């Protein structure tokens, strides 16, 4: 089984069952909601491009949901350049816009969800996260009933590690 993101939604492909594809999330929308794929801040600052993980028994999929609706757009100029050369901007620069939170401005609101593959049930983890907190990593442990969730506050001077039960949604603080 593999998972992938298309148009900000998560999908599963069951390789042993005629490569059937199933859509897991339906609320993904460009510049609004991202499921299983990080926003610019997470990709750049925390260095990852995949925000989902399978349980060790492959029965659950956990993912981070990014709500970037309150993050302002940022525009910067594009010039011809050399790598690659963008000939359409040889005479006049173009502009590229994307969600980019300046210091003190809202970041994406993040939450952790699990999807029970056989039951097709999605649950939101009951994680005590500051409204402007970060979730830099999630990973299932060898125990399929234990999802490790790492959190940081906005100032990144408080790190918490939680173990979440993906079925009950309860999160237990194990390290601060």
Task: For every predicted segment, state its role.
Residues 1-176:
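Beta-propeller folds
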């Amino acid at each position: 089984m593999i998972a992938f993101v298309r148009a900000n939604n998560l999908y599963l492909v069951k390789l042993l069952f005629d490569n059937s594809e199933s859509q897991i999330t339906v609320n993904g929308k460009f510049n609004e909601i991202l499921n299983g794929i990080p926003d610019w801040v997470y990709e750049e600052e925390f260095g990852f491009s995949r925000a989902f993980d399978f349980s060790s028994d492959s029965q659950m999929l956990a993912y981070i949901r990014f709500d970037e609706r309150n993050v302002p757009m940022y525009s910067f100029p594009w010039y011809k350049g050399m790598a690659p050369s963008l000939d359409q901007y040889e005479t006049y620069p173009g502009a590229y816009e994307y969600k980019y939170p300046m210091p003190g401005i809202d970041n994406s609101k993040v939450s952790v969800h699990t999807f029970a593959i056989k039951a097709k049930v999605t649950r939101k983890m009951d994680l005590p996260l500051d409204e402007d907190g970060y979730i830099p990593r999630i990973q299932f442990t060898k125990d399929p009933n234990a999802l490790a969730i790492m959190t940081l506050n906005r100032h990144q001077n408080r790190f918490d590690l939680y173990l979440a039960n993906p079925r009950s949604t309860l999160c237990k603080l194990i390290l601060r």
